[in-house]
Amino acid sequence: MRAEQYLKTCLECTIKKLGYTWPKKAVIEIPQNTLHGDLATNIALVLANNIGINPKNIAEKIAEKLQQESTSFSSVSVAGPGFLNITFSPTFWQKTINHILSKGSSYGSCQLGNKQKVLIEYVSANPTGPLHIGHGRGAAIGDTLARLLRFTGYNVTTEYYINDAGRQMQLLGLSIWLRIKELSGIQVTWPEEYYKGTYIIEIAKALLEEQPDIISYTDIDGEQASFHFGMNVILNGIKQDLKTFKVEHEEWFSERTLIKTNAIEQTLKALECTGLTFEKEGALWFQSTVFGDDKDRVLRKSDKSLTYFALDIAYHYTKYNRGFDRIIDILGADHHGYIARIKAAMQAFGHDPMTFDIILIQLVSLLENGIQVAMSTRAGQFEKLIDVINEVGVDAARFMFLLRKSDAHLDFDLELVKQRTMNNPVYYVQYAYARICSIIRKAHDLGFTITDVNEVPLSNITTKDELNLLRLLDKFEDVIYNAAQHLAPHYITHYLMELAGELHSYYAKYPVLQSNEKTIVLSRLALLQAVGQVIYNALNILGVTAPKNM
């Protein structure tokens, strides 16, 4: 936030002249009551407490010097026992326009990450069926976080973990093989746990067409052929759906790689070297309770088979070994109990838990005509992500998935998202940008063109609504910084809703092109250009287009 940075610089200079240094507990914040000014600080109270003097006296000295030495403040007042309330001058806020337009598409970016190498793993759905809308939410959040962290100075790599070695994959092969038998006229009994979706039938038909003699295979060979064919078909479908959704993974890491390279056994040996494993009843255990887990965890069972937890440890061990400074996992909410144990394992290897973030994605309920659509992959009764995308569009789907905090339940209302009204959040925001573009085109046709914003007289930007818009535009840098720091892309969607609301309200009061004064038209056009640039930058981070026409 430019205003906060500027105020802090001025305060540091002022208190230095008074013989003081910036105290650790001093804060600058936005007052809850806007009548108290743009910013407030407790610096006088903290200084007074540290050196044992009257806070009101020192607050008055700071206020006097601030106003003497800078024209950027229209008022600096002392409130209560020694709080300082600061209101910036219109001239200060007007410069926000120049700042934004000079920065352009980089406005809001920063070097928070300092080129730190980050690996974000997301979606990682079992290749046992098409992606559904729950996966879509994780995809939107993961991809947006990657964009956001790159925008704030991180070196980001994105990864999809292919669960291709577990029981679910075995069931996929068995399900397809059984369908092949059924399609070939053989009577079969269908176990409850097998996959029953129509996509299984389509895969079986495709495999029969490609390999007509497959029905002559033994069950073992038929199941294996079905598994490999089915997994490739489904995985290719997943990749295509993600591409359509504007989601890209740079790395596709196969679980089978861990087995083929003996990475699991190597990881377990490394863990044993930490002294945090033990043998009990023929099984190998990890002392995860040392790091706060509620119980110790089995790594290798008494029958010598490995647990899923052992595979997960090996996978995450490779993440750090590949040179990443920070690991981010985006998982379904059903993984809540998994967090403590996997973090404990990484701590056992000496990794700081602050370098490992796990974001949980809560469920999505699809509403159609006000009724919730039930979803179950096993039964084949689920809403495919691609169907939702085809119905509402990529932009609408992404924006809606990002509208709420990731660990909050989300109702996805199909009818609302398809509406071209102000009740539809994504339409509300995109229309704000399109409206600005339309005004600028009309202005150009009327002979109003801004070639250099520094030549535009911005002193006309003085109304309460205009200054509120500028305050909100100045806040964008803070929104991006905080969204990246807290891994919270919903901060951006909420900000966009607020900014779009201010823009629509402003235009209703001040039809930009209807003023008789050229300088007013040009200054307001510059303001709209700045608003448009911020909306564009924010939507770009979300992976949502900023349409010039609607």
Swiss-Prot record:
Its main location: cytoplasm. It catalyses: tRNA(Arg) + L-arginine + ATP = L-arginyl-tRNA(Arg) + AMP + diphosphate. The keyword Transmembrane does not apply. One of its GO terms (cellular component) is cytoplasm. SUPFAM superfamilies: Anticodon-binding domain of a subclass of class I aminoacyl-tRNA synthetases, Arginyl-tRNA synthetase (ArgRS), N-terminal 'additional' domain, Nucleotidylyl transferase. GO terms for biological process: arginyl-tRNA aminoacylation. It comes from the Bacteria. GO terms for molecular function: arginine-tRNA ligase activity; ATP binding. Keywords: Aminoacyl-tRNA synthetase, ATP-binding, Cytoplasm, Ligase, Nucleotide-binding, Protein biosynthesis. It is found in: Cytoplasm. Its EC number is 6.1.1.19. A motif ('HIGH' region) lies at residues 125-135. Belongs to the class-I aminoacyl-tRNA synthetase family. Monomer. This is Arginine--tRNA ligase. It comes from Lawsonia intracellularis (strain PHE/MN1-00). The gene is argS.
